Amino acid sequence: MDRNGANMLDGRVESDAKGSFRKDYTKMENNNNGANISDGIYRIIRSFKSFSHFFIRYEEETKEREAEMEIGFPTDVKHLSHIGVDGTMTTFDNTSSSFPFSGFHLTGTVV
């Protein structure tokens, strides 16, 4: 016992505003050297809970990676038409009736 009357044989002494006191445990101190079945079961359950979190995080990461991979798809796009006029501007005949701007002057020549 220490000077406040608390038992310090197991080294587990707590204190409050009134002084030190020994924490009550549900362990059987004589038969199993401080081992408690409920503490062991609690530790096993806690380890299973923490172990299952690894799989949950892994599933979330794979979903995020799949979402990242889908950005930019589809890559096999077939272009069916072009906006504007096909070919180069030097090959056009500006006197043609199919030319949409035949009424306007191009490069300073009069039609």
Curated annotation (Swiss-Prot):
It is a peripheral membrane protein. InterPro entries: CRIB_dom, RIC2/4. Residues 71-84 form the CRIB domain. The lineage of its organism: Eukaryota, Viridiplantae, Streptophyta, Embryophyta, Tracheophyta. This is CRIB domain-containing protein RIC2. The keyword Chaperone does not apply. The keyword Disulfide bond does not apply. Interacts with ARAC11/ROP1. One of its GO terms (biological process) is pollen tube growth. Functions as a downstream effector of Rho-related GTP binding proteins of the 'Rho of Plants' (ROPs) family. Participates in the propagation of ROP GTPase signals in specific cellular responses. Is involved in pollen tube growth regulation through its interaction with ARAC11/ROP1. Expressed in roots, leaves, stems, flowers, siliques and pollen. One of its GO terms (cellular component) is plasma membrane. Keywords: Cell membrane, Growth regulation, Membrane. Its main location: membrane. It is found in: Cell membrane. PROSITE patterns: CRIB (PS50108). The gene is RIC2. Over-expression of RIC2 in tobacco germinating pollen reduces pollen tube elongation.
